[in-house]
Amino acid sequence: MNIGTLILCPWDLSLRNLFLFFYLFLLSKILFLFAEIEMPVLHGDIAVADTTYKNAEPCTATEKGCKWPKEGRYVYVPYYISPDYKEQNIIIRGMRSFNQTTCIRFIPWNPSVRNYISFFTQPNSGCWSYLGRQKGVQHISLERGGCVRYSTVQHEILHALGFNHEQVRSDRDRYVRILFNNIKRKQQYNFQKKRTNNLETPYDFSSVMHYNKYAFSKNGLPTIEAKGDPAPAFGNARQMSTNDIIRVNKLYRCSKLKTYSTFYLLCEYV
């Protein structure tokens, strides 16, 4: 949609023209905000800005520049949910799970706030998020018809808070084998090991951030193989694990760390 250009001559600055000028200016900003969003995606569902190509490994490794700011005991994250969703309750439940188990507090966005996350859906937009806090509006794509699931909402929010996928942890080779011969060539970068801050927590096969064993397979064979006997199942988490919650509390230095069982979360949110 194109906005016509309004030319104000210096001798015709009537209140009516000034009002029309500012109306068109604000309308153009709103249309830009909700215009079609196309972002390069790293690690399957992690978006990176065209200008910086920043990803989250340095964020959680250095804890500088990627965390949302803390005010007192809490970390307030403003959010906006597109009215295109009929499933807003699922997104709200996902955010509420952080309010219940961590010091993260999701609060409705108001226009005076510059930094916030915005959940949106577009045809073929898929599921993705930025890694760590960005400046200004920070989009989280949850395409209707496939991405608006409780576990996916938690997964993408964890990216926005600064967390990477489990299977790219710096110590992953002790727990899994990455079968590169079975991975689509253009997707192999998704499995490269990264420098991560593991926050003194163990590798977690039950993490909501773990890929499943056939992720990006080119031939129907596994791309990730768990070590151990018996080999643990992984990649189909219905929600955040206990370790996922503990990591958020540690990274953001929440004052009272608690252990939340999977049973508690299932009873609370199913």
Feature names for model-found ranges:
Residues 1-17, 26-270:
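Zinc-dependent metalloendopeptidases
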